[in-house]
Amino acid sequence: MKKKALLLSGLVVVALSAGMVGCGEQPSTTTSTGGDAAAVEVKEVEMSYISTADLKDNIANPEYLVLDVRKAADFEAGHIPGAVNADMDAAKDGDNESGIANMKAALGDPAKVDQKIVLVCYSGKRYAQCATNSLAVLGANMDNVYTLEGGMKAWDEAGYAVEK
């Protein structure tokens, strides 16, 4: 009986240890366009969130830049007033260089990486994560980068204004 308990305890420790190894830093994703182009290394960065109510209260505040990171067609179909599109569809599929290029184009002025940036995607997950990672590569002040909780879906469900 003691041998079984000891063996079971040992297996639990091994299983927990193996599980903890998987909880470390997220792996880097590297993408290259091939040829002599330099690879773009993108590390997964932790996201911070803003509620729909807080964004609504600050929508007219010039300190905030709202970047809608959904597909361009979905942005055109309806977006938060004043938002700028930075399509992250290619980055979501592993093309980090395109994601970074789209983010640069949406920002326009490189100094905008220091202002408060709110990322809007479909549900506040994959596209927003790609955008957060791209902003980190561009040197954004990550203390000022927020993802809209629940994404555009939550904004729509709250009944807030949308423009086309």
Please annotate each region the language model reported.
Residues L65-R70, A86:
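Short hydrophobic beta-strand that contains or immediately precedes a catalytic carboxylate
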Residues K2-G10, A15-N61, F75-V118, Y122-K164:
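Rhodanese-like catalytic fold shared by cysteine-dependent sulfurtransferases
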